[in-house]
Every structure is written in structure tokens, then in C-alpha cells.
């Protein structure tokens, strides 16, 4: 008898509530996956900054290689 009290609400949940819940969850998730215009601009800006930082690091390493050849061994 106690199993019946648990089985009926669980069956209703699995048959009606769970499919609607999953459908709403994943339909909202797919709509949010696109980046907004400001997010795309920020991403491009960060990529440019990373490129400039990489170039500066390479320049600094070439200066250190010329002035102190064994600096990487430390």
C-alpha cells in the first residue's frame, strides 16, 4: 500500500512534468548560446590584446636572449 502512494506521484511526474521540464530547459539553453554584439566586440578586443601581449613577450625574450644567454636555465 505504501508503494502505491509513492508510485502514483512518481508516475505522474515522469509522464507529465519531466518531459515539459526538460523541453523548456533545453529550448531556453539553445537560445542563450549566441553571443551578443557587445560580447563579440569584447572577445575580439581580448584576442587583439592577447596578440599584442604575445608579441611583447617574444620581444622581451629576444632581448633577454641577446643580453643574458643563460637566463632560461635559472
Swiss-Prot record:
Coiled-coil blocks: 33-68
Main location as per UniProt: membrane
Keyword Cell membrane: yes
Alphabetically ordered keywords of this record: Cell inner membrane, Cell membrane, Coiled coil, Membrane, Stress response, Transmembrane, Transmembrane helix
Bilayer topology term: Single-pass membrane protein
BP terms from Gene Ontology: phage shock; regulation of cellular response to stress; regulation of DNA-templated transcription
Spans traversing the lipid bilayer: 4-24
Inducers of expression: By heat, ethanol, osmotic shock and infection by filamentous bacteriophages.
Pfam families (alphabetical): PspB
GO CC terms, sorted: plasma membrane
InterPro entries recorded: Phageshock_PspB
Domain of life where this protein originates: Bacteria
Subcellular localization: Cell inner membrane
Similarity field: Belongs to the PspB family.
Function: The phage shock protein (psp) operon (pspABCDE) may play a significant role in the competition for survival under nutrient- or energy-limited conditions. PspB is involved in transcription regulation.
Quaternary structure note: Interacts with PspA; could bind PspA only in the presence of PspC.
Protein name stated in the entry: Phage shock protein B
Species: Escherichia coli (strain K12)
